[in-house]
Amino acid sequence: MKLTHNFSFLLLLLLVHMSSKHILASKDSSSYVVYFGAHSHVGEITEDAMDRVKETHYDFLGSFTGSRERATDAIFYSYTKHINGFAAHLDHDLAYEISKHPEVVSVFPNKALKLHTTRSWDFLGLEHNSYVPSSSIWRKARFGEDTIIANLDTGVWPESKSFRDEGLGPIPSRWKGICQNQKDATFHCNRKLIGARYFNKGYAAAVGHLNSSFDSPRDLDGHGSHTLSTAAGDFVPGVSIFGQGNGTAKGGSPRARVAAYKVCWPPVKGNECYDADVLAAFDAAIHDGADVISVSLGGEPTSFFNDSVAIGSFHAAKKRIVVVCSAGNSGPADSTVSNVAPWQITVGASTMDREFASNLVLGNGKHYKGQSLSSTALPHAKFYPIMASVNAKAKNASALDAQLCKLGSLDPIKTKGKILVCLRGQNGRVEKGRAVALGGGIGMVLENTYVTGNDLLADPHVLPATQLTSKDSFAVSRYISQTKKPIAHITPSRTDLGLKPAPVMASFSSKGPSIVAPQILKPDITAPGVSVIAAYTGAVSPTNEQFDPRRLLFNAISGTSMSCPHISGIAGLLKTRYPSWSPAAIRSAIMTTATIMDDIPGPIQNATNMKATPFSFGAGHVQPNLAVNPGLVYDLGIKDYLNFLCSLGYNASQISVFSGNNFTCSSPKISLVNLNYPSITVPNLTSSKVTVSRTVKNVGRPSMYTVKVNNPQGVYVAVKPTSLNFTKVGEQKTFKVILVKSKGNVAKGYVFGELVWSDKKHRVRSPIVVKL
């Protein structure tokens, strides 16, 4: 089915009304993005050329408003460099009329989006006890030297040692960016932090007038400094969090140059970033000369032409810029993954082999290991009464609110001097401890639910606290209910290394299958995203709560926002090592060398001790030292993506405008399963068989590869040919994968397997995902 302009707009309005989050966004704002696709600039983009584009935007909108002056007042962004479009204050009827214009690809509301280390690089094998072996990708890729990594986030704290420029040479001459500090004299860039910009007009269109404190790329949240330093922070020795996790903090490409694009601001109804600002930042980062763009934010899955991150990523890919995105923090439910365009690298989150342990010791002598980064501790070996928080319920509070330890839900008379057991969920984990402390409680135990299982997060609690697995939480609750005077002690936090099993998928990590394009497996890869230590801001506390007076220059945070920049840093290394490789080749190297095994070894598990699937980890857990020498890659170009969009239902005229060139869809249209992706997904094996085509390119020495297949349950897989002989670098070979339902098959739903090409030196693995 083709998506016409009218249908696309009506579909978007339907999605808006289906989502309460988007209802709030559209009620707060009558601002829209009008997207025309790509520019047709020839050669260097001059100021005059950009001014001419801006004038055409005023003329275009003026033709609808009846006044060029009104159009000029309405437009608050003109995208004039690589992305062609504008953001403006429009009413719904006018937006709908504009969407019908043949030159318009899409019109969509200025939607709100969400923001989605000392040990992690050791865990990934780039170093061992601060020693960098010759096999490390760091050595082979010169630590990412002079690659430019841009970060779309909450800005940057420029004073952080992670962004010092000692030992760096001149800024690369190809860099065109600026340090936008005209209204913040305290903000300075250098040879490491080579650029910083801020974009807040879309945010202002949604929330109203902003004061002068918003006119700076300075990070007042901490998220942006953390993600940027994870991707490319310098080596900073002696870093710890309240004495825990001591070591040298560093990013994946520590010798890369970095640029911060501030697009996220104080939350409004839980959302921090807006489409109009995100598009403006992409347009700037592409023009400025970024090699890698890291994007730890996203929204609800939607049509690619109505998705600011997908649009910006496509225009970046046209300029051979690698774009890495977080998968989202809406797990463990299926089909929650965001940022699912095939021209993006989408990253899930998993644990590493370090934990910040804090034990709960009960009066019966039982010990239960939890995790915490509390900055205070109970007196040594002193026990206190322990009780379920629901039994400390305030008179006017609900039992559920008390169970969750919401602010104001606890009776101080019942709480004083006790350790309270609070249920994880709904309100913030640190906020729960705050509620206990305000009630006079001495400590807190945070109970996991069945859904969060073994997923433990070390938080900087404001009182002695620890978080327990669901199994241990049940045992503690049973002790409390069966003991006349239950007592307990919480031990101080400590750092434990070599944890097994690791990695484990984080329960919050969003999962596939993609609801936008189920033929593409998303996420693509997983990386460390739990309790990652990296740079922070000096402006707020480690909990980001106003009641917390503590300040840290480094912090431990969890989320796919943290795993995303790990892959961004690795992409930076590969860009340094192989500057001519396409973004697709870099993604392929990362995916096909990943592992699906933990350090026991056994299959990677989820937070409930079940075997995880590719819908959680994609191709697997990243292995950077193997990614630098993948042997073969699955490559893709812009034409491949455009043909994919044709097959997805977009019409040729839309796609031509989107790409900036006249484009004719291939005839016949390609099968969606035949996009040359490093994974193979057949979302509906209803016919007798499906044949999938793939092409691999040799990026190593001449070699003979043979294939091995692990069949998904109930599916027989044949590969033709079964061997590929490569005689030179750059040589390409095509093979077919035939998938057939097995006779007598009883399997239903999704099943999983793998296809591996090997020459005994390289192992080029692709996951196979089939729905029966």
UniProtKB/Swiss-Prot annotation:
Q: Which residues form the Peptidase S8 domain?
A: 120-628
Family in the record: Belongs to the peptidase S8 family.
User: Which region is the signal sequence?
Assistant: 1-25
Q: What is its EC number?
A: 3.4.21.-
Q: Which cysteines are joined by disulfide bonds?
A: none
Q: Which residues are glycosylated?
A: 211, 246, 306, 396, 606, 651, 662, 684, 725
Q: Where is the Inhibitor I9 domain?
A: 31-116
- Subcellular localization(s) per the UniProt record: Secreted; Secreted, Cell wall
Q: Which CDD domains match?
A: PA_subtilisin_like, Peptidases_S8_3
What GO cellular component entries does it have? extracellular region
Source taxonomy lineage?
Eukaryota, Viridiplantae, Streptophyta, Embryophyta, Tracheophyta
| Upregulating conditions | Induced between 4 and 8 hours after treatment with auxin and remains high for at least 24 hours.
Protein name from the UniProt record: Subtilisin-like protease SBT5.3
Q: Which biological process terms from the Gene Ontology are attached to this UniProt entry?
A: lateral root morphogenesis; proteolysis; response to auxin
> Chief localization class?
secreted
Question: Gene3D superfamilies, alphabetically?
Answer: 2.60.40.2310, 3.50.30.30, Peptidase S8 propeptide/proteinase inhibitor I9, Peptidase S8/S53 domain
Expressed, tissue-wise, as follows: Expressed specifically at sites of lateral root emergence.
Gene Ontology molecular function terms on file: serine-type endopeptidase activity
Residues in PA domain copies: 398-480
